[in-house]
Amino acid sequence: MTRHWPWEVSLRMENEHVCGGALIDPSWVVTAAHCIQGTKEYSVVLGTSKLQPMNFSRALWVPVRDIIMHPKYWGRAFIMGDVALVHLQTPVTFSEYVQPICLPEPNFNLKVGTQCWVTGWSQVKQRFSANSMLTPELQEAEVFIMDNKRCDRHYKKSFFPPVVPLVLGDMICATNYGENLCYGDSGGPLACEVEGRWILAGVLSWEKACVKAQNPGVYTRITKYTKWIKKQMSNGAFSGPCASACLLFLCWLLQPQMGS
């Protein structure tokens, strides 16, 4: 049985899934900046594990009011500041199926080897290709936090001369040596349970990680942007508690009833 991740968001462009995201507040979603393409019409779907809900009795469809890109975002060629805030047209109501994930404090630090989870609608495979198809049901993969220097060395072998830094301080790596999420899940959450709370450690940034199964996932490190995120929100405060481990367990038990 698949767990239920109540903060998971499908970011839609003209009603087509383009990226994942994480709900952090009734009115706000965090995703990757590189997911955003100009002034297209965006919306989000949440409260369901299905990519194409048959009805919206529990699933929510919400138009997007505004999207705020981080000013340091450089673009796909050399990704820095790969984080964006999605402001929803109307606040969502929390339920068993819709809950926010906690933002980490700026000084929060995850130890190497910490167990975390990544989620999204791409195929979980040992071998990836650019033609990987989206799956109708939300997928999950267990991953472990990886040392940034080791992660950087891994990618330098494949892409750049050794003197060029790739994995920067605003990034965080996680791996499970072959099982990872791939195309279609940029912006999706790297979620870690710490002392009974679920923390948004990162959002998926590098799709080049899909090229080889052994490549670690590279995520935008949310601690580097917590202050910026809170500043963009109207009062910097959250309207409800973020998801606890106890609540997630309850959601997991209720998951078979979702069906929408």
From Swiss-Prot:
Disulfide bonds: 19-35, 116-192, 151-173, 182-210
Source organism, top-level taxon: Eukaryota
GO biological process, one term: proteolysis
The protein's enzyme class: hydrolase
An example Gene Ontology molecular-function term: serine-type endopeptidase activity
GO cellular component, one term: extracellular space
Keywords in alphabetical order: Disulfide bond, Glycoprotein, Hydrolase, Protease, Serine protease
SUPFAM superfamilies per UniProt: Trypsin-like serine proteases
Limits of the Peptidase S1 domain: 1-234
Residues bearing carbohydrate: 55
Active-site residues, as the UniProt record annotates them: 34, 82, 186
EC number of the protein: 3.4.21.-
Family the entry assigns: Belongs to the peptidase S1 family.
PANTHER family registered for this protein in UniProt: TRYPTASE-RELATED
Protein name per UniProt: Putative serine protease 45
Protein's gene: PRSS45P
